[in-house]
Structure formats: structure tokens, C-alpha cells
Amino acid sequence: MQRYDIIRMIGKGGMGEVYLAYDPVCSRKVALKRIREDLSDNELLKKRFLREAKIAADLVHPGVVPVFTICSDSDPVYYTMPYIEGYTLKSLLKSVWQCDSLPKDLAEQTSVGTFLSIFHKICSTVEYVHSRGILHRDLKPDNILLGLFSEVVILDWGAALSKEMQEEVLLDIDIPVTGSMFSNMTIPGKIVGTPDYMAPERLRGTPASESTDIYALGVILYQMLTLSFPYRNKKGKKISFRHQISSPEEIAPHREIPPFLSQVAMKALAADPKVRYASVKELKDDIEQHLQGSPEWTPKTILHTQKAECWKLRESILLSKYFPMLGVSPALWYSLAISKIESFSEVRLEYTLLRKGLEDGFGILLPPSEGVDHGDFYHGYGFWLHIKNSVFSVSLVKNGLEIRKTSRPIKENKEKFFIALEKQNHRLSLIIDHVVWMIHMDYLPGRGGRIGVIIQDVTDVCGNIVVLESSGSLQVSCLAVPDAFLNEKLYDRAITFYRRIAESFPGRKEGYEAQFRIGIALLEKASESGDSEGFTQALGKFEILHNSVAAPLEYLGKALVYQRLGEYNEEVKSLLLALKRYCQCPEISRIRDHIVYRLHETLYSNHRLSLVFMLLALHIAPESINATEEEYFVKNLHGKIQDTLFCNLDLSPIDFRSSKMELLLSYWSGFTPFLPGLFQKYWDLKDYRALADVFYVAADLGNREFLEMYSDLVRENICSTTCTEDIVEFLPHQLEHFFSGVRAISLHEPLEKVFAHIEILDPVLILYLFDLFAKDALIHHRGELILSAITLIEKYVSSQQYYEHLLPCEVLAYLWMKDEKKVYNLLCNNYEESLWLDDRSPAFVLYGCWLALVEDSSLSYLHLSGCREDALYPRALIGGFCSPLGICENQLSYQERRKLLLQKFIFFHCLGMNEERDNCTVAYDLLSIERSL
């Protein structure tokens, strides 16, 4: 100990003494703990003293004081630790015990909220210690140090024990033994710990466990909540094994202890270890839930399924009339019941269903308060639950539209299912057997007011439906009144109250949320009245949020306005700006959640924007797409994958979560902001084949800015690029010649310039150039040049590539030249007649155009209209156009609209409808320039 200058003693325990010392080598104060001199000759006690130091040294956590040095060869043995200024939790509790009134600062220090944050840190430390296989065995306020700078550390590891170790012979209990020289320390043969903090089973001699540490934490929590012990006894007296502990709420009503925290404390203090928390993590999570303001559910009412007085409306309905997308038989009748009570702003419903009821199908709805008597019960949100072939499916419905679905296999012998639905703030969750199956976020004030149930046989509900209410948070309560006005469409009154809240909470979350909802109210009002000025006013209110901590809400609000106006380019632009500018802002999660919602909304309504939102979701929130949804999305994209040149030329399967999928979605949607990121990724990997794919997509979409910027970058770096074995498909300098060909196509230069370096180009690049050239030549009335191009490049590609990619264009060229015999011969010699009738084959449209050229137009329309309507490939879109039902071009993606215009162009040309044909050229060029989503 000669190295240290002892300043003063700061503590004394059973085996050791703690001194404040100065370390001149490190120029710092330390806490030095040494074994008591009168015990230094006891080898067993010395071993225990060093074990305490080694256990603490092995733990690395902010809640454990680290050990600097351990000196086991000195006399006496000692170890050093950082010196933390502060006081024990016991001294703080002692300062307020049995005090009628407290000074303001002490009242704040010992408030329930302050103590909870301390207790959460204690739990975090014990959770870590347990994860390392260590039991403390003597958790109590004496052993918890509160630093002056918010440190919370656990002291005294003398009783600590590895869970793998058995109880030692030398055990201790914190009870003095009169007349013994060891009166303040471990007594051989006794139980380790302090009786007031020991679990009942521990007092009976049961070995220590995580559960006994949890019990000690329960006593500490009880003291923090009530400022008193859960039971009273004098040390040394016999402790009852069966004791009744009063609820903290009853003991200290003046402390305003939330019922939830009382339940937490009582669960930790349960006499039966099986009833206690299974781990410290579970206890900590409950405390964390309260600290974060998460809902704490308490039962409020019960809906008796078979009692008429609980229901405002009960009638039979044909479910298929209101929810046609659920695939329910049109002849099946279901019972609909709408509750008399209105649900709370935050509500949880709990019920148990028989398997039979789920096999028939069960719906739980949150319809609006108004209009339920007039058939509007399907408005708002709800869940449809169904079991078929031991697969449990859950569909989220909104306004009668299925916007999301998930399915999972279940056990064949399972007959009952516990279901819970939670509505909390912007979150709607469905829980099955205590597992979250689906979460949906909606940041607009909810319209749901009542509770609706759809079922075939009410006896399939086991018991009743329990309605639980959450205590909620300040934000929800202060916004509840204007939200209610908004739900009742009293827009002006809602705006008045929102404005008051915004003015009352400047710079705070509540104020920003109120400002956001002012814009929402104006948007709803404008949508209902059709007032264009109202949309402008809503945009203005959202702009007030600019550069605030809630800045992402400005762009979310604007996106909602543009969505309502049908200005989808501006909608997506707003969302992208938010993601780019505020990626670190907490509110950005609302943008991500909205994008995922829009993906489901557009996909299930077959909207062309679904590809854009799928691309956005893959880029920013891939984890939000589960395996079932992924399978559904890939199935929907199958036709597009088949009709994509860079997918056909690369036979490797396309993974949904790959960069290639992002490129595919960019190509079909015409949405190019992610192309620079894909370029950078492939450039870093030196994947020149993938780079060629990116440049082909940019060229096809007419993104000249990207082509010029990044082709120059490639040219500048080609000379310094070292060709290695990794470059397996083609050399980087081939890209330079590809760029020259693309530029020649855009300038309508002669064919020889487009394919000037064909002899050194890889066939993939040749086919990319040909595809770009052929489409440009055909739509601009130069279809005959396609034949010249084929003659030039035919010898550089394989026979299979000729058949798949050149032959269809050769037929198109002869259709343009109206050479009916040549077209017919090419069809007969290269395609079986069965393929002429297969809309998945290129021959289907080519044959239809040949019929338009040589036969009556009605025959060509009849042929083309024979295409399948359920899964129409992009290569056969003209078939949908010719069908009696027609095709909704507004639902087609950017690339589908271009393909349809090309097909209509050659079809009208063959029919001799030159004006309609020329209109297609104008529309094609305009679409390429505007590239509207």
C-alpha cells in the first residue's frame, strides 16, 4: 500500500475497510478497500475477500464499479477502485422515512418518477450480472450508491456467487452475533444475505437463484414507491414464511402510485417463485414500458356476446357485399354486431375464439360512431381472421379494402386462440396467443368510435369480449378534444382547439403535433368541399413545421395533400426530401411507416405507384416486408421480370431484396433517384456487367443527366482501372463504346455510328444497343432501319439470342413496311401455331397485328381480346386495350404505358389509322420527357 497516500476512511464492512486514497502515479483519487487487520491471518477469509474483488473485476458495466488493481501478495491484501462521490440509496430513503412534509428538493429526489429511473438502472445492472452467470445475493439499499452525477452503481460483491457454483461451507447472514470477534461479518453455516430482502424460500434454506435476486429488487421497488418496508419486523426476530403484503397504493395513497406499478411490485414480491418475473429483463421491460409512456391496460367493461343490451345494432349481412376481396362465398350470411359503447382513444380488446369460428372467418372492426345504422360499419379499420388447411391468415381491412395480409401455419390440434387488438396513438396491433402478428401505423386522427364483430356463430367466442382502457399520455389527452371534433367533421372547431394547443406548447412535441393536425383538418375540409384554396391553406400550415424538430411532418403533410390531388410526382418528391434531409430525426419513422402503408394501399388497389413504393420500402425499410408479402410481390412481378431485357440476359434468379430488384423496379416505374446509389455500389465492386444494366436502364428511361455525369466518370477512370480475373464478362473499356452508341441513338445518327465498335462489344451490350435503337426507330417512323441493324449485328449474337430478341423486332419491321407475306412466313417458320394464341409469347401480338394488316379489323380485335385478364404480361397489353372491358391505363406503370403505346402504334399502323398512330408517337415522346409516375 506504500504506493497510495491514505486520506481518510470512508466505510467499514464485515471483512474490509474502505479508504479514500491518492494515487500519485496516476494523479487521481481512488477508493482503496483492504481486509481488516484482525482478519488478515485467516486464509479462508482472505480468499473470500479476493474472490469479491475478482468478481467485480470481471464485470464491465456502468452499474458496477470497476477494479483498478488487486494486490494479493501484500499484507494486508487490498484492491482499488474509482472513487465515486455520492450517497447510498439507504441514506436517501432514511432521510424521508416517517416525515410528514419534505423540502421541495428532497421531494423531487424521492418522487416516484425519480426513483423509477434509478430502479431501471439497477435492473439493467442486475440483468447484466445475471447474464454473466453471477448472483449478487445481497441486493439492498445499503449496497446501491447514487453518485452526484446520476451514477447508479451496485456495491459489495462479497456475497456474490456464480450460478454454476454450489453454496460454500462458509456462508453469511447480516445478523450480529453478540460477543463474537466476527460480530459484523459472515458467520459460518448461516444463509447469505439480509433477511429483510430475502425471499421466503431463501429463508427456508433453498439455494439462491435469479428469482431470489428478483425478490430483493421487489422489496427495493416497494420501498421506493411507498417509502416503507412491505412488512415490518425487527432484525434477529423470526420472519413469517407466509406473510400478507399490502398493495403499495393502499400503503401510500398520497404518493399517487399508478396501479400498474403496484402490480409490478407485487409480482416481484410474490411468495411463490413461479408467480414472480421469470427474469430481471421482464421486470426491467415493465418499468421501461411505464417510463416510455406505453399503455398500461386496465379492464373497463365487458361486451357480453349474447346479451342484446350490449349492442347498438345486430343484424345478418352478406359479407361478400362489403368485403368482396376476402374470398368469402357470396351465399354465406354472417352476424354483425355493433357495440353501444364507444371505444376510448387508446383501447385493447381481448377475447378467445374457437377454431371452428376462425375456420368460418371472424372480423373485428373499429367503425366510426356515425353512420353505422346506415351501412357504413365497414368504414375505418378492422381485422379479418381465417383458418384454412391449418394456415392462419390475418387481413387488415380499411374502408372495405384489404390493404395487408399475413399467414402462418398452425398446429392441427390447437382448438382455442387468444386474440387481442390494440389501438394506441397511431398504432393498430393484432396479437394472437401473445405474439404480435401485425402492426399498422396511421398518423391521421382515427375515425373509429365503436366496436364491431362479424361472426357466423356467436357461441364460437369463448366467454366475452373484454374492453381495456389505457391511462394514455399527456399528448393524447390534450389532442383528444380536437380529434373528436375532427372525427365529427366539425373542422373549424377542431382547428380552433389545435391552434390553442400549438400556441400553448411552442417548441414541444404536443405543439408540433397540433400544428400538423391543423393541416390535416384543412385537408379533410377541402377534400369534402372540393375547395382548391383549402388545399393551398393546408400546404401553408404544413410549411410552418419547416426546420423544426418535427420537420418530417411538413413533408408527410404535403405528401398527403398531393396524394389527395393526384399529383403523385410531388407526393413521392415530398417523401424523398424528408428521407434525405431528416434521416436522423426521430419523426422520420413516421415517413417510413407511411411509405410502407402506401405500398400496401397502392398494391392492393393495383395502382401504378405500387412499384415506386415497393422500391422505397426495399430501400429504407426492408424489414417491414415479411416472407408472405415478399412471395406475393414476386408473384405480381413475374410478368415484368419475363419482359425485362437485362433479366432475360442474366439467367440467375432475381432475389427480392437484391440490388437487381431495385433496378428492375426503377426500370418499370420510371423512378430513377436510386440509380446513382446502384452505380456507386457496382462501381465499388467492379461489377461492370451490372454497371451496363444500370446504364441501359438510364438510357431507356431517357435520363440524360445521369448518363452524361456517370459515363464521364467511367471514362475518366477507365485508364486507371486494372483488369483482374474478377472481371469475367467484359472489359470496362467496352462501356465507353456502349456510351458512344447510346449517344448516337439519342441524336438519331446513322446506324454505322450506333454500332461503330460492334466487333469488340460483348453480345449483352450489342443487344442493349439494339433494343434502344429498335424502339426509337419504330416509334419515329423509321422501322425499316431495324432490318439493317439486324443484318449488321446478327453474326455477333447466338442463335438463341436472335430468336428471343431480334426475331420479334424483325417481324415488327416488316409489319411497319406492311410486307404481309414476309410477316406470315416469319411467323410460320419460327413459331408454332399454338404460340400465336398464347399471350405469353411474342407471336401473340405479332399475329394480331398481321390480322389487322390482312383481315377485317374485327378479327384482329377478336384475337387480341382473347388474352387472359387475370395475369396480363406487359408484352400483350394491347390485348387488354382491345378487350370489351378495356384497360385502365391510369393503373399502368411508366414502362407499361410506353410498351402499350408502342403496341398501339404498330397496331394502328397496320389498321391504316394513321392519325391514331401519330398520336401514339406524340404521347410516347411526351411520356419520355415528363416521366410522370
Curated annotation (Swiss-Prot):
Q: What class of enzyme is it?
A: transferase
Do you know which InterPro entries this protein is assigned to?
Kinase-like_dom_sf, Prot_kinase_dom, Protein_kinase_ATP_BS, Ser/Thr_kinase_AS, Ser/Thr_kinase_PknD, TPR-like_helical_dom_sf
Q: How is it modified after translation?
A: Autophosphorylated on serine and threonine residues.
Record EC number? 2.7.11.1
Q: Which CDD domains match?
A: STKc_PknB_like
> Which Pfam families does the entry link to?
Pkinase
Q: Which family does it belong to?
A: Belongs to the protein kinase superfamily. Ser/Thr protein kinase family.
What's the name of the protein? Serine/threonine-protein kinase PknD
- What species is this protein from? Chlamydia felis (strain Fe/C-56) (Chlamydophila felis)
- List the top taxonomic levels of the source: Bacteria, Pseudomonadati, Chlamydiota, Chlamydiia, Chlamydiales
